Regions:
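C-terminal and inter-domain tail/linker signature
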Residues: 1-129
Length: 129
């Protein structure tokens, strides 16, 4: 398995995201994001970017593990503080990215984070609607 392309794409993606740049350029035109616990599916580069921007605003203290790479895929495990209460409970998640032709073609999020951006309609300036 050659993980060279997935590593380059994901590194570029998180670099853009971390600098506040337009990470939608890392997505295929028909990209989709699926959050399984709420059944949310968001399609399109701009729509996925906006959804994730709102989602991240509602995920305090995100911590991630080292990224795992495979042929045409990358996997990120992490957790965030539960914003619903002041306990030390954390919400675990795993994101699986599909990668082809130098872009992210799909991403699937496993974990109970759907409530953080429940309807998929996110205004980048204000977070989930």
């Amino acid at each position: 398995m050659d993980a060279t392309e997935p590593r380059a794409v994901i590194t570029h993606y998180f670099d853009f995201m971390g600098r506040g740049e337009d990470f939608a350029t890392c997505y295929a035109e028909d990209v989709s994001w699926t959050t399984f616990d709420g059944g949310t599916v968001v399609s399109g580069p701009t729509e996925v970017r906006d959804y994730l921007t709102g989602l991240h605003r509602n995920m305090p203290d995100i911590q991630t593990r080292p990224i795992a790479y495979a042929d045409e895929a990358a996997y990120v495990e992490g957790d965030c503080a539960d914003p619903r209460n002041a306990s030390t409970d954390r919400i675990p998640f795993c994101i699986a990215y599909d990668i082809a032709n130098g872009v992210i073609t799909a991403a699937r999020c496993y974990g109970s984070i759907g409530f953080l951006a429940p309807d998929g309609r996110v205004d980048p300036a204000s977070g989930p609607s």
